[in-house]
Swiss-Prot record:
GO terms for molecular function: DNA binding; DNA-directed RNA polymerase activity; protein dimerization activity. One of its GO terms (cellular component) is cytoplasm. This is DNA-directed RNA polymerase subunit Rpo11. It comes from Thermococcus gammatolerans (strain DSM 15229 / JCM 11827 / EJ3). It comes from the Archaea. The gene is rpo11.
Amino acid sequence: MRIEVIKREGNTFEFYLEGEDHTFANLLVETLHEDKHVKFAAYSIDHPILMARKPRFKIVTDGKESPEEALEKAAQRVFDRARAVLEAWKSAIEG
């Protein structure tokens, strides 16, 4: 996974997230939408074959937090949820 910055201007951040597809991209966008300071968050895949694992993201915030801060917070929430699922899974299989 690698972030390639396309544009950073004001409260807008656009970037590619190399190595990911719709599965993670949709999860990240939905998690960004939970942030009250995020006014817009979406992704697209420019070409379904050539760029299938390189979604393009756009995040716009209200200025009370930067798009990068919103991205970091969303990534942490995704990580925390994945950890909770793993712990629940371990508890379930251990009895």
